[in-house]
Amino acid sequence: MTKTPEMTKTAIAHGKYIRGSASKVRRVLDQIRGKSYRDALIMLEFMPYRSTDPITKVLRSAVANAEHNLGMDPSSLVISSASADNGPVMKRFRPRAQGRAFSIKKQTCHISISVESAPNQTNTEAQN
């Protein structure tokens, strides 16, 4: 008899139109992906990047969604996926000498973070 895998509950949060480059946000998301919620918060607090503030806000929102909508325990949550996509670019111009103008591109990005409950250690030990 084969056992069907249990459906894992996943809570998702999105942050849209965040000022900052998607590539700079991705370097932070790559470091917290797969970590527990508590470890990720500690890492984000001490990273020297500007993008950690909006990422922390989206992460807290995902955990609040898991706690309120799905009734999950925040201490058992793990970041299952985290991604940053390019958003619209605000184009501005800086006046230069002799009537010229240089373009300024103000990048935005969309951050998506999903959390799910960590696999229970006692269940895996009992199955072995």
Curated annotation (Swiss-Prot):
It comes from the Bacteria. PROSITE patterns: RIBOSOMAL_L22. One of its GO terms (cellular component) is cytosolic large ribosomal subunit. CDD domains: Ribosomal_L22 (cd00336). One of its GO terms (molecular function) is structural constituent of ribosome. GO terms for biological process: translation. InterPro entries: Ribosomal_uL22, Ribosomal_uL22_bac/chlpt-type, Ribosomal_uL22_bac/org-type, Ribosomal_uL22_CS, Ribosomal_uL22_sf. Keywords: Ribonucleoprotein, Ribosomal protein, RNA-binding, rRNA-binding. Gene3D superfamilies: Ribosomal protein L22/L17. Pfam families: Ribosomal_L22. Disulfide bonds: none annotated. Part of the 50S ribosomal subunit. This protein binds specifically to 23S rRNA; its binding is stimulated by other ribosomal proteins, e.g. L4, L17, and L20. It is important during the early stages of 50S assembly. It makes multiple contacts with different domains of the 23S rRNA in the assembled 50S subunit and ribosome. The globular domain of the protein is located near the polypeptide exit tunnel on the outside of the subunit, while an extended beta-hairpin is found that lines the wall of the exit tunnel in the center of the 70S ribosome. Belongs to the universal ribosomal protein uL22 family. This is Large ribosomal subunit protein uL22. It comes from Prochlorococcus marinus subsp. pastoris (strain CCMP1986 / NIES-2087 / MED4). The lineage of its organism: Bacteria, Bacillati, Cyanobacteriota, Cyanophyceae, Synechococcales.
